[in-house]
Amino acid sequence: MAVIKAVSSKAGIGQALDYVTKEEKTEDKLVSGLHCEPDTVKDEMQATKELWGKTGGRTYKHFVQSYHEDEHITPEQAHKNAVELAKNTEAWKGHEVLIATHIDRGHIHSHFIVNSVNYENGHKLQWSKADLQNLKDRCNEQSRQQGLHIPEKGKTFSGEEREETVAWNKETYNLLKQAEKGEVKSYVQDTALAVMDCRETATSREDFIDQ
C-alpha cells in the first residue's frame, strides 16, 4: 500500500535537499534527478531561480510516496515507481525534480523536491487539489498493476475495518454517523481517518508530523 502526501515545511530548499540525500537514509543508486543532476541539484535549482529573477517566495514543493512496512516491495522498485510518477506528472513539466528513496526506517518511502520555478519559461509551479488527487490516483494504479495493496478509506492495511471514530458530544456524533452513510461530508471524520492513515505508515514522531 502506497500513499502520497504533500509535506509542509519551513526549511529552505538547500536544507530540504540536504535532508533527503543524506547517505544514511538512502543509497547513491536510489537518488535520481528529473531535468537535473543529483550531484549539482542545489546549484542548478538556484541558477534557474536567478535566471528568471524569482529567488523569493515559495522555493519548492515537497511530496512523499510512502509504502506500508508490510508491503512486499524492494527499494529499487519503489524508486523506479517514484521516478515514473515524477516523469508523468504534467504540472511538473519543465521543473527540476529530485527523487530520493529512503530505506533507513521501517517502511520504504520516496521524497520529491520540486523546484518552484520552471526552467523553460520562468513560471512558478501551479499545484491544485486536482493535481494532488491525480498523483494519488496514478500511485494507486501503480500498486494495482504490481499486485500491491490499494488504500481503502476506513480500512487498515490488512483490510480490516478501523475502529469507530468517537465523538464527545451528541451533535458531533450524529454528524459523524451521517458522514459514515455518505449523507454529508465531515471534515472531522476526514481528519480522523487521515490521522489513522498516518498511524499505519509512520514509524516515528517526526515521520507522523511530516505526513
Feature locations, PLM:
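N-terminal nicking endonuclease/strand-transfer module with a His-rich metal-binding environment
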Residues: 1-211
